[in-house]
């Protein structure tokens, strides 16, 4: 099963991927991030996630029974936290509806 949230801004690996691997690099931190629900950004002006719930919206995490169900939702990029860390899938690489695993660049991103 997969518990996930929607992230609005800059979901590409060069930004969000690096934010996730820098600031949410353990199962506990990833779970804490997801528990907040849908968000504008995982790392904003106040050096923390900016959740929709902070502006009064009710956007809890989404539950999918399988990884395939999660990956079929049509997002541009999808991220899964695994025992090896964050994995990124480009959902539209070849417009064939098949997720393509892409590399998350190394190095901290100052935001």
Give the residues covered by each predicted segment.
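Short, extreme N-terminal segment that most often corresponds to the first beta-strand
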Residues: 1-11
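Extracellular/luminal recognition modules and glycoprotein regions
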Residues: 11-20
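Low-complexity intrinsically disordered segments
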Residues: 21-111
């Amino acid at each position: 099963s997969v518990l996930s949230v929607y992230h609005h801004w800059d979901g590409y690996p060069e930004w969000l991927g690096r934010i996730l691997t820098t600031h949410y690099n353990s199962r506990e931190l990833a779970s804490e991030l997801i528990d907040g629900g849908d968000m504008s950004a995982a790392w904003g002006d106040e050096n923390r996630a900016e959740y929709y719930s902070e502006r009064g919206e009710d956007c809890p995490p989404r539950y999918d029974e399988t990884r395939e169900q999660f990956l079929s939702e049509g997002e541009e990029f999808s991220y899964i936290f695994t025992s090896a860390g964050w994995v990124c899938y480009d959902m539209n690489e070849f417009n064939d509806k098949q997720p393509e695993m892409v590399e998350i660049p190394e190095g901290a991103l100052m935001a």
